Amino acid sequence: MCVVFSPRETVSELDRFIIGQSDAKRSVAIALRNRWRRQQLDGPMRDEVMPKNILMIGPTGVGKTGIARRLAKLAGAPFVKVEATKFTEVGYVGRDVEQIIRDLVEIAISLVREKKRDEVKVKAHINAEERVLDALVGKTASPATRESFRKKLRDGELDEKEIEIEVSDNNSNSTSTFDIPGMPGAQMGIMNLSEIFGKMGNRTKVRKTTVKDAFKPLIDDESEKLLDQDQIIQEALRVAENDGIVFIDEIDKIATRDGGASAAVSREGVQRDLLPLVEGTTIATKYGQIKTDHILFIASGAFHVSKPSDLLPELQGRLPIRVELNPLTREDLRRILTEPEASLIKQYIALMATEEVHLEITDDAIDALADIAVDLNARIENIGARRLQTVMERVLDEISFTAPDKAGTSFKVDAAYVKKSIGDLAADVDLSRFIL
């Protein structure tokens, strides 16, 4: 299922969306390629090759999450992002770390199901067309009548005609489930019962809709009939085991420092609970057992207060690749505004175009935006590229509000307009830190 790229191609693809941070891009590109290399090996050796998990160190807003998320999208791999602070040691109130793997399996099932749906889309569309014709002319109509209506249907002449269709009532089969504390996967029995009763009942509901709007629910319905659910689950478990990527953010927040308070006990407990996951263990899910041996773990943190060496030595050893991401410079911020395929400026221009307003942002305006972002990051708090969104929203506030009334006009943003719009924000910067 995973798409194969060479490390150079992976870095090149990441460059389209993320500025700078070449060391981090190289590390994740090599890790991705090593997965493909492992799958080319024979059985015994393949089992021995473990993924080289990565620890990204760098301030907020420099691209840590963006790199991991783009990597997963690029590879077509199941990806889950979690914050380390959301989890608690087993025995405390809160989520336990095994839920990370269960979430990964759910995402893998969604990915595999979408892939399988695409494979049966043509067949499902043909079946859906037959059901629309049944609703239009009845099942007993002559072949000539059906063909006549089929031609009209394909030409779009019947799009607005109202019909009644019968589709599966998926909601009727859903049963609320819960995990029993200390018994991961204990909801399996409940799920199996709901599936049994669902198959026995096979309930449907009648919907009144237009011919045009009927196709989507009918295609979904027919796709489900053509899919083998057991095969989807088995493939999803395999994909999650071999291609899954888990991104653990804010891992520095659970690093314990010498002389810490009692809360450090729970933080250290979370680290100890993470150890078997990262090293390789078997987790029970409602779909079956899943091994975590070959899942790629990418941990990240700013490490402003703590240091990577404050993590448990065992956990440090399971994150062998260390990458430091650099703080963003003025030039980086300027490039972020313009170079990525979906840069902020391109986004705002596209949004205004939906209102028939032509937005132009000059080069000196881009320089001014970058300068202001750097200044605010230095004077308040360094939140990296996220500061650009704050600045852009303030600058374009007026045009965003009045755009519906100015269809067919052009609007030019230059350095003078930027400074005029942002003046009060920059002036109040010293006061803003005292506002709760």
Swiss-Prot record:
InterPro entries listed in its UniProt record: AAA+_ATPase, ATP-dep_Clp_protease_ClpX, ATPase_AAA_core, Clp_ATPase_C, HslU, P-loop_NTPase
Chain residues that bind ATP: 19, 61-65, 249, 314, 386
Biological process annotations from GO: protein unfolding; proteolysis involved in protein catabolic process
Compartments in which it is found: Cytoplasm
Entry's family note: Belongs to the ClpX chaperone family. HslU subfamily.
Subunit structure: A double ring-shaped homohexamer of HslV is capped on each side by a ring-shaped HslU homohexamer. The assembly of the HslU/HslV complex is dependent on binding of ATP.
Entry protein name: ATP-dependent protease ATPase subunit HslU
Gene that produces this protein: hslU
